[in-house]
């Protein structure tokens, strides 16, 4: 299995001369996420020393990003590992930011589906605000910058007759596999990397069939050349080839 033998995306950027940072709003759990995250020059799990019941919002990650942006690094690569929309959904956003109501019932029961859906949708709105804030921070630097956002899974919320809930089914459902894949580029980046910008525009409507495209797209966005990069898997390459989705 290649994952045991090859270095991760953070090391690829580090070896290309980038200062690298990994910040997580989840607790370390001896997973590959921890292993690859700790390859960074700087890394931090902001919940690591907090009491188990502590609820830390993803916005705390932005403070760490702000420090990195102001530390004077010429080339910088940051990976943010958010808590996102994990259950319990209502704990993922401030109550005064709820867009959809009612969202007060949180027990994982089919009869509470309306409440659970509203709370889940509120987490998506909160993530939208997080990404907007992150983009604004990058814009203020006037630097050549790009951001890629995706999720490692979607969520079942009693969506069909199977009444599945969460995201750990033996056979993943449509709702677990369809996730966002978003790329933003600053004006300076678009001018400095016109090939990547044109490729992303060209591929924007094409489906992405697997998470391997995250790795190869980031290499392309960073202008990194390596024998491991496969342009056919990078949406930032004009050689990208869309593949059939599972659903």
What positions do the PLM features span?
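Catalytic domains that recognize anionic headgroups
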Residues: 1-247
